[in-house]
Amino acid sequence: SAVTGVPFEDAKHLQNETGIFIDKFYINQSSSDFLYDVMTEYGGCEAFYTDFYMNFVCPLGIVRMNAKGNEVNCNYYENKKLQEALKPIILESLQNQIDCGIDTSVCYCIGSGENFNFLSKINEEHHFFDTIIPLEHPRFIMQYNSKNKDVYMEKYLCALKS
């Protein structure tokens, strides 16, 4: 997502779905594959995006250098100093999105750990959403629990259809 700027959209799906090609970044992420599978089961991308708005808690794509010298995705919550520095930007971004008229009765938080904890904390302070439902992160599912992918897909679909 840091490469494309589109939530959970890798370069492969972006090109296949929209025709937009990002040179030198034609990669496929299992997180994106998982969410596309959920969307397909939901009724397809058009049905999904007709019913849901998807975006990041943090609007910035952040990368860091790994031990091999390669740029890798970095989540805003991996570094507490970074998280605090970005908090005003995050709050402004969330408010701007809400000001566009999105339904704030339910927020599905992709990431049931630190992302959910941070979003819940700022929601307690700012009352952005009536309810926040945590869903396991697709990377966690695909990297550590791929044998239970169907169980997690069903969890996503039940939450989204409730």
Residue ranges and their predicted role:
Residues 162:
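Charged phosphate-binding loop/patch that engages nucleotide di/tri-phosphates or the phosphate backbone
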